[in-house]
Amino acid sequence: MHIKLANPRGFCAGVDRAIEIVNRALEVFGPPIYVRHEVVHNKFVVDDLRSRGAIFVEELDQVPDNVIVIFSAHGVSQAVRQEAARRGLKVFDATCPLVTKVHMEVARYSREGRECILIGHQGHPEVVGTMGQYDTANGGAIYLVEDEEDVARLQVRNPVSLAFVTQTTLSMDDAARMIDALRARFPGIGGPRRDDICYATQNRQDAVRQLAGECQLVLVVGSSSSSNSNRLRELAESIGVPAYLVDGAQDLRREWFDGIRRVGVTAGASAPEVLVRDVIDRLRQWGVVNVEELTGREENITFSIPKELRVVSSD
């Protein structure tokens, strides 16, 4: 059995930054550090941070006074920010800068009184946070659409003053279809010059396309709560290749590999490389004789952390 590794895979710049913010806060201020929502959607990462003193909560009413709280990489609504400010909580914001970019677009449309349509998955924390950037007090409204049927049913107040944004972790193919449907339904709709899907999501989906073209089965290392990891599995399946989403080596099943000679392995943007290596080690035990790293788009993007956390070790 032969393994091909997708490239790029695993952590993106936004995830690196979010995890570093929690780690640095623990180092500088000591535990407990409160984090609103899982800082990234990966069980291994969250369990590790929890073991070192991070406390994960879903709402600020679970956070006591006079503590440090970190907002997750997915972003939060303006109402959450206002509540934190009202209570005087010390906040470090781990929102991915590419999500913040979408937030700024939505806030601008709101200020202009322009209606906004968000393409995304209902209930996902990024979507909740993005919807919460829109202030209807200026006379506009924001709408969420998940599929083309939603677009067909959507009734807006003012189709000539309308714009769209997208969740950053969507399938590129699905987003393109949705944007086409919106433009067909509302010819005057505005939006970003390109969709808001982030560079890491695009690169990992492109890498999976290559992987699926060369392999008989694809493994995606990532948690079931991770939107971008689920999209990678769905993309491989849409190409006609069986694909499985696994949190780690413990989720592998030997029967998946009966008659399989070429296995593709990738990882979602919130999955650490150590989990990929664990999967490879397990597959070596089951007969893998060769591991090949595919070439792919190089990623050299980094995002800075808050100044207060940029401490230099005294070691």
From Swiss-Prot:
Which top EC class is named for this enzyme in its record? Answer: oxidoreductase
Positions that bind isopentenyl diphosphate: H41, H74, H124, S226, S227, N228, S270
Q: What is this protein called?
A: 4-hydroxy-3-methylbut-2-enyl diphosphate reductase
- Catalytic positions are E126
Residues annotated to bind [4Fe-4S] cluster: C12, C96, C198
Keyword annotations for this protein? 4Fe-4S, Iron, Iron-sulfur, Isoprene biosynthesis, Metal-binding, Oxidoreductase
Q: Indicate which residues the UniProt annotation says bind (2E)-4-hydroxy-3-methylbut-2-enyl diphosphate.
A: H41, H74, H124, T168, S226, S227, N228, S270
The cofactor remark states:
Binds 1 [4Fe-4S] cluster per subunit.
> What family is reported?
Belongs to the IspH family.
* Residues reported in the UniProt entry to bind dimethylallyl diphosphate: H41, H74, H124, S226, S227, N228, S270
Traced from the root, the source organism's taxonomic lineage reads: Bacteria, Pseudomonadati, Pseudomonadota, Gammaproteobacteria, Pseudomonadales
Q: What are the required cofactors?
A: [4Fe-4S] cluster
